[in-house]
Amino acid sequence: MDYKALGLKTGLEIHIQLNTRRKLFCHCPPVLRDDEPHFRVERRLHISVSELGAVDPAVVWEVRKRRKYIYEGYRDTTCLVELDEEPPHMPDEEALTTAVAVAKMFNAKLFDEIYVMRKTVVDGSNVSGFQRTMLVAYGGRAKILGYDIGVETIALEEDAARKMGEEGKAVVYRLDRLGIPLIEIATEPMTYAPQQVEEVAWIIGYSVKITGRAKRGVGTVRQDVNVSIAGGAKTEIKGVPDLSLIPKVIEYEATRQLSLLKIAEELKRRGVEKVELSLADVTQAFANTKSKLVRRVLDAGGKVVAVKAPGFNKLLGAEVQPGRRFGTELADYVRAWTELGGLLHSDELPGYGITADEVRDVEARVGVNSFILLMGVDEGELEEAARVVVERLNAAPRGVPEETRAANPDGTTRFLRPRPGAARMYPETDLPPVRITFEILKKAEEVAKVTLEGKLKELTSRGLSRDLALQLVKSPHLEKFEDYLQRFKEVPPQQIAAVLLNISKALAREGVEITDEKVESVLDALNRKVITKEAVEEVLRNMKPGESAEEAAKRLGLLRMSYDEVKKIVAEVAAQVGKEKAVGEVMRRYRGKVDVEDVRRALAEIYL
């Protein structure tokens, strides 16, 4: 795919939990708990205008779902601030210092005074109905690893409550995560290829982690990706779970937008401008149906209704992403706005047990050959689903609607909610502005001294190539490497890195279980000069449970020969094959048991 010709633009929003002693707006500890909660409270959210007198479209969408929210908490680690029963405390200075330090890393412009804002969030993940956020800096730019990274904004905000599950129409959240400090770094639009965007995301995340002030583990970093192509629209894709998925998400979203533009072009060619909301009860067409899907609804007292989609013949089944069609997009809308499980459309029928005769019967009843079938018991839900479908059909001739979408595990995306409007953000009335003091700046400057480029320089100064140093930094083994450097001082840094990055990975691909204990035992044997570096892979491959590297080497006949033994062997081999071929021949005959440096030294001494 020629992304330049497509006019691909991407943006990143990287959210990283900070490792602080308290939450951002209260003094509760920022810990997640799995034990039984001490209490539960129930809340409902209601729509109202913001302090600016406007209503956000995303709010309208969420409130119409009429959900109840249940919050679980602990008396010793959650408080009234999380329950929105007490005003927020002043922001945590430790978190603010980290945000200022990150701003300095990216040469962003700091605000002298920071205002706490309320960002409307009505999916229940914030008890108050809004998330408190502070814009710390803007307009940053840094060149790191050859990438020119423009940073639009750096914000400090509170994380949302943790979703634990659903109970019917109620969503259950746990308050332990609510209020944990979160730094959000939003980039300027980029024209990099998808693979390069993944690299940029890693650079940003690592730049925060290297300060030692970021939390580690699953769920501590979240990536949102904004994607658009020429003629398309900005689409925000929430919750890309893994950096490696970013290229696929971008590729598939570009494909989706291109497909939607082609559908729009075809609709214009067909003269389709507007679809009228027309709902026809076609239950009788399925009176004798053998379709299990339809029969289940009818047996429950439900009915089947058809929504006319004139002009959409063969377009409802058009693929927009791998395994997803335009009809899937419509089904996403239905699932998002109602409790219905989805829909069927004429391009996929006959199918699902529905016969050609039943399809012809429906066509006769609605008067068109392209239609949407909705099934359910609740008439209100069916009417709402029909309205949503028609709205999305009417958006199709305009191309790509602005949406917030969610990432699927395979890199495709699904509709989540409409894009929020400007009415989403307004000032926090319970807190005064926060000044960036000289003390905060001084502390932040110290934190900002630790950089990615600085870490790479430190590693290359130890003898690692830049490529190997970068591999190590990108791996989860950097802390182990630094620990092993101190513990196994006789093992060259390059050898430690090779064991962690290359040998362990190659053996794991063979199905060999590699544990920290095995690696440490092998490095200890190397450190004591019990084995050679050539024997490492074979020893690791064949170590039995509970066996040390030295014991395994002895069993395998791979204990390192003493220097006197090596010298004797070198003299014998050199006499047989000559001085020039002696090193290679000794290594061939005794590989794994002799160290090449010992062989060279012995040869040099013999022929002095």
UniProtKB/Swiss-Prot annotation:
Q: Which SMART domains match?
A: GatB_Yqey (SM00845)
Cellular component terms, GO, for this chain's entry? cytoplasm
Recite the UniProt keywords alphabetically: ATP-binding, Ligase, Nucleotide-binding, Protein biosynthesis
**UniProt key word Signal:** no
Which reaction is this enzyme known to catalyze? Answer: L-glutamyl-tRNA(Gln) + L-glutamine + ATP + H2O = L-glutaminyl-tRNA(Gln) + L-glutamate + ADP + phosphate + H(+)
What is this enzyme's class at the first EC digit?
ligase
Q: What is its EC number?
A: 6.3.5.-
**Region annotation Disordered: where it falls in the sequence:** 401-428
InterPro entries in the record: Asn/Gln-tRNA_amidoTrfase_suB/E, Asn/Gln-tRNA_Trfase_suB/E_cat, Asn/Gln_amidotransferase, Asn/Gln_tRNA_amidoTrase-B-like, GAD-like_sf, GAD_dom, GatB_C_1, GatE
Q: What is the protein's name according to its record? A: Glutamyl-tRNA(Gln) amidotransferase subunit E
Gene transcribed to yield this protein: gatE
